[in-house]
């Protein structure tokens, strides 16, 4: 795709706003859009950039980021992996926070490592974050000093570096999947004569094992410098004070003399097409990707009105093509199960973009799938897109923008921060949602659809299958799997390019979702309910609980529940039950098959899906206030007229079969299957779905089960939470819920009392694998009548063990990259507690890790927990609890749990957290875990592992 030609064609069509002038290369010149006026933006004399914004969601919280224009592409050959290694070292000792004090300080104020405190490294950037910090003068200053130390104060002590080598090794081991290995092997071919082909961020383990500490220090001094660093602070803070503190703290950092030149490494154009096909024994499925490479937006366009207009055109075009491809998948003879079109960076590089297609071919249909997808692109290049397609894509795009705009005063910090990170790293515009909304309003109201069509048609005529064209295939390496050759794929592309095709016909159903509006039923009573909800009892027996909130001006949540679920159906139907949610959510509704329904709902932000729990029938959905009627129409159709969409069913089964056939050989799948079967003693209700099981599935039986479970909403409790008009809600409830047929009595719960295995159970098994790795899951459990206190204690036990294992297994032992525990006490069909510990580990260290896992539990049984550990848990939980009070989903879950199970999870929760004592956790371990003695351990080792 030639961006320059598209810009000029759009300019000629007057799709772009009037340009100020045309430069010597014929490019339209436009002024840069100003940064959002609510953002304090500046640059220190040393070159460091900062962004500060006051925002009160969440209240009394702030987030702190530092973005570095440095990634693995800056590494020399002998440094491969140092950018990522350096990211790790930022948590292992700095000028103001030696040792592990960054993590210790953050967790002491309720900021959890991994969840709120983290970082990532890619080819072109490294970004660090401290999220959801409780604001106080001390906390804010400390977080700014953490950012300062990341920028210019790492200690990089040799002992800490040597410890971290093992951690990096375990991260590499954990991430070494089939797709990652294929990508690493293929990058040099996908990026000929480009540094991006040799700079996968995890690096080379030979470098990680052997680099000298001084080399890492030199890399840090060379690249972590003010002109490449951006500070972002967003939250409930005083902007003037933060700006002054940034100036005070960061201004002393000196720009290095004779600083190394910062380069944007190019991705050279390729005159000949690139075809890369690779396979791996642990690749889960066959995948094809097609790329039409192009240059990124030129600097003179980036950050201007034109960037929005180009983005609008490209995204509409991609949406139209994706919709066509999705429509094709519903045909029985379609050679692919799924496909989608998008525009983004070319794989891992910022200096080259690409239009790309993602294809999941059906087994043995790879060349046919590629040919079919390419034919659709050829069809667009020959005939263009239709105006009706564009209207739908435009309406859907605009409805998403409106949803954000209507909630513009209630956006969380997490909404703003990525915008400023991208502005700093890539020059993306950030004028604010008010300006963006005006831009898109103008594009949808002032630019005729015919003109949009003309511009998009031009865009798709620019794509060559020779120059800058790439086809990349990733395949399983297994007996009987036919991997296509590059020549076969090339022939498929060439044949498609020569095809003379008919124009696409856009078949649209214009009838209403609900052709005949049902006769209204009655609301027979109204009563106050718990947590500020109101309950309407309907004439047919249904109950509707609703709570109007001001948390999110663009959100209305729906949940509906009834006793029933899978346990009401024979285990002979287990495969049909396993498929139930996917099938009934992917088929159509009423008179609309799935693709017809998608077209009908374009521009509507409303959805509604059914699901079967073990003992409950469930319906969940959401809408904007504007689309509330549509949500109710979907509810009505879910109960009264599900669609007999056999094409959608057949496509889903074909997709699942191809995925499962390949996945069954994967070590991760074997481990997951073994964990489930060991815990539940091979009970057929907890059997992992296999490809062969799909032959026993029946769409007719699934529809029959659906009719049994969702014949009417009269025995359901419906919950609506969010920003709605109560009069409208009343009207829609009377029309679409109260009108459903009544039932003689509500169903009661059927509980089969399926419990985990009792006693001490060990399952150690081996599997062939490409990268030797071990996995451990350990589950402690027992029956326990539920109390809020036990729930808090079990949660605290999991969190504190996670911190201990992080220290003993990861930091001190270098045995694992990711290790943790999660505990809880549960009400519902079974009242019980459970503690689950997970640890992907170096095979040689499995026994040592198991000993440390057991030691962590025994230490708490004998000594309890420390005051510091307890305080960290309490800080985080109380902070998290306060934040939840402003979430619609939190309140909806509360009322649903209370009505269904009789437990109030709100009243007294803060007191239960604040009153928690070390002996509570100690006694829980002694009196439940150790006394009950139910401990299930599942471990997987490589087949060729020798002690």
Feature-to-residue mapping (PLM):
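Hydrophobic, small-residue-rich alpha-helical packing segments that form membrane-like cores
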Residues: 160-228, 232-234, 239-246, 255-264, ...
């Amino acid at each position: 795709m030639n961006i320059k030609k598209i810009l000029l064609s759009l300019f000629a069509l007057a799709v772009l706003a009037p340009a100020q002038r045309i430069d010597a290369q014929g490019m339209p010149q436009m002024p840069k859009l100003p940064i959002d006026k609510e953002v304090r933006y500046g640059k220190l004399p040393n070159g460091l950039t900062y962004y500060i914004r006051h925002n009160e969601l969440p209240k009394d919280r702030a987030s702190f980021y530092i973005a570095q224009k440095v990634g693995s592409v800056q590494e020399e050959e002998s440094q491969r992996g140092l950018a990522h290694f350096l990211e790790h070292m930022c948590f292992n000792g700095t000028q103001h926070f030696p040792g592990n004090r960054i993590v210790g300080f953050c967790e002491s104020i309720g900021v959890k490592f991994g969840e709120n405190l983290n970082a990532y490294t890619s080819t072109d950037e490294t970004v660090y974050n401290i999220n959801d910090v409780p604001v106080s003068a001390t906390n804010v200053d400390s977080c700014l000093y953490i950012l300062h130390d990341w920028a210019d104060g790492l200690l990089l002590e040799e002992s800490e570096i040597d410890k971290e080598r093992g951690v990096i090794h375990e991260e590499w081991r954990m991430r070494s999947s089939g797709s990652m290995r294929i990508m690493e092997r293929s990058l040099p071919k996908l990026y000929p004569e480009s540094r991006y082909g040799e700079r996968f961020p995890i690096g080379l383990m030979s470098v990680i094992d052997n680099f000298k500490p001084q080399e890492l220090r030199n890399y840090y001094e060379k690249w972590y410098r003010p002109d490449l660093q951006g500070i972002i602070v967003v939250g409930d803070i005083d902007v003037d004070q933060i700006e002054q503190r940034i100036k005070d703290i960061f201004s002393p950092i000196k720009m290095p003399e004779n600083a190394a030149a910062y380069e944007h490494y190019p991705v050279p154009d390729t005159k000949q097409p690139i075809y890369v096909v690779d396979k791996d024994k642990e690749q889960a499925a066959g995948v094809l990707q097609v790329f039409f490479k192009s240059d990124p937006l030129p600097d003179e366009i980036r950050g201007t009105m034109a960037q929005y207009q180009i983005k609008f055109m490209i995204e509409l075009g991609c949406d139209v093509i994706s919709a066509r491809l999705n429509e094709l998948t519903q045909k029985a003879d379609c050679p692919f199960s799924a496909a989608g079109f998008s525009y983004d960076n070319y794989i891992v590089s910022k200096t080259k973009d690409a239009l790309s297609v993602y294809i999941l071919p059906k087994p043995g249909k790879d060349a046919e799938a590629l040919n079919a997808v390419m034919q659709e692109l050829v069809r667009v290049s020959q005939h263009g897109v239709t105006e009706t397609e564009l209207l739908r894509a435009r309406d859907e795009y605009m409805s998403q923008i409106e949803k954000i705009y209507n909630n513009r005063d209630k956006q969380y910090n997490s909404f703003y921060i990525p915008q400023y990170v991208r502005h700093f790293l890539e020059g993306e515009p950030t004028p604010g949602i008010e300006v963006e909304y005006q831009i898109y309003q103008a594009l949808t109201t002032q630019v005729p659809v015919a003109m949009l069509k003309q511009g998009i048609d031009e865009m798709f005529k620019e794509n060559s299958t020779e120059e800058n064209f790439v086809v990349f295939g990733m395949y399983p390496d297994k007996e009987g799997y036919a991997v296509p050759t590059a020549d076969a794929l090339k022939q498929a592309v060439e044949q498609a390019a020569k095809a003379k095709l008919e124009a696409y016909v856009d078949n649209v159903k214009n009838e209403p979702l609900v052709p005949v509006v049902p006769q209204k039923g009655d609301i027979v009573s109204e009563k106050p309910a718990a947590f500020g909800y109101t309950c309407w009892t309907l004439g047919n027996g249904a109950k509707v609980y609703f709570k109007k909130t001001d948390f999110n001006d663009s959100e209305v949540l729906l949940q509906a529940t009834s006793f029933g679920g899978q346990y009401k159906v024979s285990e002979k139907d287990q495969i049909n039950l396993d498929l139930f949610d996917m099938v009934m959510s992917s088929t159509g509704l009423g008179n609309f098959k799935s693709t017809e329904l998608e077209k009908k709902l374009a521009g509507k932000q409303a959805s509604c899906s059914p699901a079967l729990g073990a003992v409950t029938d469930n319906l969940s959905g959401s809408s904007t206030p504007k689309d509330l009627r549509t949500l109710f129409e979907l509810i009505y159709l879910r109960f009264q007229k599900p669609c007999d969409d056999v094409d959608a069913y057949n496509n889903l089964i074909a997709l699942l079969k191809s995925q499962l056939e390949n996945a069954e050989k994967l070590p991760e799948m074997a481990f997951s299957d073994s964990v489930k079967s060991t815990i539940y003693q091979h009970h057929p209700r907890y059997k992992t779905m296999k490809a062969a099981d799909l032959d026993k599935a029946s769409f007719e039986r699934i529809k029959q089960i659906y009719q049994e479970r969702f014949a009417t909403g009269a025995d359901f409790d419906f919950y609506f939470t969010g920003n709605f008009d109560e009069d409208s809600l009343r009207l829609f409830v009377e029309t679409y819920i109260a009108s459903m047929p009544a039932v003689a009595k509500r169903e009661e719960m059927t509980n089969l009392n399926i419990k985990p295995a009792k006693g001490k159970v060990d399952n150690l098994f081996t599997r062939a694998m490409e990268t030797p790795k071990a996995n451990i899951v350990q589950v402690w459990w027992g029956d326990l009548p539920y109390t809020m206190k036990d729930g808090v204690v079990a949660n605290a036990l999991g969190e504190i063990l996670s911190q201990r294992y992080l220290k003993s297994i990861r930091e001190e032992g270098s045995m694992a990259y990711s290790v943790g525990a999660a505990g809880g006490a549960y009400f519902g069909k079974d009242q019980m507690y459970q503690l689950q510990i997970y640890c992907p580990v170096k095979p040689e260290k499995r026994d040592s890790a198991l000993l440390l896992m057991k030691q962590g539990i025994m230490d708490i049984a004998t000594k309890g927990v420390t005051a510091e550990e307890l305080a960290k848990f309490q800080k985080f939980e109380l902070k998290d609890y306060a934040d939840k009070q402003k979430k619609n989903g939190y309140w909806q879950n509360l009322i649903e749990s209370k009505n269904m199970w009789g437990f109030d999870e709100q009243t007294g929760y803060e007191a239960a957290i604040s009153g928690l004592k070390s002996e509570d956790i100690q006694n829980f371990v002694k009196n439940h875990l150790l006394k009950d003695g139910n401990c299930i351990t599942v471990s997987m080792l490589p087949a060729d592992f020798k002690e």
